[in-house]
Amino acid sequence: MVIKMGDIESENQDIENKIKELARNLLRGKEVDVIIGYTKGTVPLSSSPVFITNEEDVDKLVWNNLCYVNLANYLAPRIPTLYDDEGQKLKVGIVAKGCVGRALIHLAVENQINFENIKMIGISCNGIINRKRIEKEIGEREILETSILGNNIIVKGRDFEETFPFDEYMNELCKVCKVKSPPNVDGSCVGECLENPVVEDDFNDISDFESKTSEEKWAYIKDTLSACTRCVSDVLLQSVFRGPK
């Protein structure tokens, strides 16, 4: 699949700047009590969730293609950070790409959250790196640093440097994602938000798989499951008795 994209490095900086601007405005205007976003991870190929309550800490917020955690998980009930000293729910601002927005809607449908207490900082997600694939190709070599340069992922370690094209090493789900920004539910979103998202079904990947021979399908399945020792062991064990279908 060919992915049309701009300069990912520049896009990341623009998205990060907008996140900081919107977060700062929400805190300054007392529209929210806390911002949930992403900050730099403690190890390469990672990011970490962060809770920001002071305008002075907004610069800790980052956006890069390693922001894989679904922040909607942190809006689950009974998380102490989201309540004040009197047990009242805080007003929350949350950095939301498309998949985070969809997760929030699901929580709202289950009556676990109320959009009256939530303000989404909407962004147009430009894709998340397939960490597992990169780690597999790097092997046992220790990764010390990762960065985006133009449209390439740069991975550095002791005595090595590898370059991976971003469009090829993006998560497969990101490649086919049609809703990159969150929906604007009852005016709960600022920034990049979708008013009436319309998604067209696209099953090209399924058609491609169905067109493969039995041997090609089997090779694809084994490669896909190779990152999970238990899964691939189960599949290979079954093949001993039944053989590939």
Could you describe each region identified by the protein language model?
Residues 1-217, 241:
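Iron-sulfur-associated redox domains of electron-transfer enzymes in respiratory
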Residues 215-245:
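Long, well-ordered mid-to-C-terminal structural blocks that present hydrophobic/aromatic surfaces
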